[in-house]
């Protein structure tokens, strides 16, 4: 079974339809739609119908969407901000359902660069409470539309909560597995200096998605390299995913091309790697 997918995030210099063309040409059966980067508002009516036709014409399955990030998060530090973004996330849950996706990726907390008074010592507590309120609002909506929200580990060097699988696992255990899971971003693990094997084990059976890319440093921007172009041990990674009986998609999210390499060539390189790595 070919359980691979490729993120449109890998095509920053292309429209969403051009990204779909390249993903299809590279041989992937499924795609993760980057919302915010490629679709900034949920499509409706004729635009929605046309987009579904574009997916079908390329024989691509929209396996997941990535909700807008940046300001759009569960753990906003003011109630006005939180309500606004929870409403945005609800609208994208509906969009995910409308295009036949099963999962939506969410950043649980904001990047400190977006947080007013980012060093406020009360921020961790404020964020924890905000995340809970947002999830209490969104879980019934996700259930209604048949979408699972997957919370992503994040590469922020700060004292905010919910940046690792270890922390996120404790959070998602409080909610139904059909509506809330985890997505492991491998590059973010590397940026944070965490151990990929331990993060996978911490996620365990609540791991429902992956963002697969390599990393060669501990700063934002050191990740999103092609597989085996950084420091991650991909054999150990796959072995551990098999040990926890991971059955979700293998979604590749490389963005950084090498010199004179196009975005489509990076997707093809990654596809070649995936076929060997996963024995497709």
Predicted segment positions?
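Histidine-acidic metal/acid-base catalytic patches
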Residues: 1-8, 12-27, 90, 100-102, ...
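Active-site-proximal loop/turn and secondary-structure-junction residues that shape catalytic pockets
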Residues: 10-12, 35-37, 68-71, 110-112, ...
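Active-site acidic/histidine proton-transfer and metal-coordination neighborhood
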Residues: 15-18, 57, 74-181, 235
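Hydrophobic residues within beta-strands of alpha/beta enzymes
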Residues: 31-32, 63-65, 104, 149, ...
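Glycine-rich, proline-tolerant flexible connector loops at the mouths of alpha/beta enzymes
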Residues: 33-56, 111-114
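The substrate-binding groove and active-site-proximal loops of carbohydrate-active enzymes
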Residues: 37, 75-83, 187, 228
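Metal-dependent catalytic neighborhoods of phosphoester/phosphodiester hydrolases
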Residues: 42-48, 77, 82, 261-262
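Catalytic-core regions built around general acid/base machinery
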Residues: 47-59, 134-141, 199, 236-240
């Amino acid at each position: 079974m070919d359980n691979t997918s490729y993120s449109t995030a890998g095509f920053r210099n292309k429209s969403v339809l051009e990204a779909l063309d390249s993903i299809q040409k590279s041989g992937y059966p499924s795609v993760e739609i980057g919302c915010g980067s490629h679709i900034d508002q949920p499509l409706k009516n004729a635009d929605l119908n046309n987009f579904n036709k574009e997916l079908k014409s390329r024989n691509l399955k929209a396996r997941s969407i990535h909700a807008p990030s940046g300001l759009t998060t569960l753990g906003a530090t003011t109630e006005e901000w939180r309500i606004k973004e929870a409403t945005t996330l609800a609208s994208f849950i509906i969009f995910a359902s409308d295009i036949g996706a099963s999962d939506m990726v969410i950043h649980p907390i904001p990047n400190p660069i977006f947080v007013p008074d980012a060093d406020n010592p009360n921020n961790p507590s404020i964020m924890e409470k905000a995340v809970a309120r947002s999830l209490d609002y969104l879980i019934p909506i996700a259930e209604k539309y048949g979408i699972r929200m997957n919370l992503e580990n994040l590469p922020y060097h700060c004292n905010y909560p919910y940046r690792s699988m270890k922390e996120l696992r404790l959070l998602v255990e409080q909610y139904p597995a059909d509506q809330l899971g985890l997505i492991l971003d491998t590059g973010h693990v590397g940026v944070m200096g965490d151990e990929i094997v331990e993060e996978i084990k911490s996620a365990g059976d609540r791991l429902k998605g992956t963002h697969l890319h390599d990393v060669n440093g501990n700063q934002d921007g050191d990740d999103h390299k092609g597989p085996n172009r950084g420091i991650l041990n991909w054999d150990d990674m796959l072995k551990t995913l098999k040990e926890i009986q991971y059955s979700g998609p293998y979604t590749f999210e490389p963005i950084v091309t090498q010199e004179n390499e196009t975005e489509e060539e990076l997707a093809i390189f990654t596809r070649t790697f995936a076929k060997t790595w996963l024995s497709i």
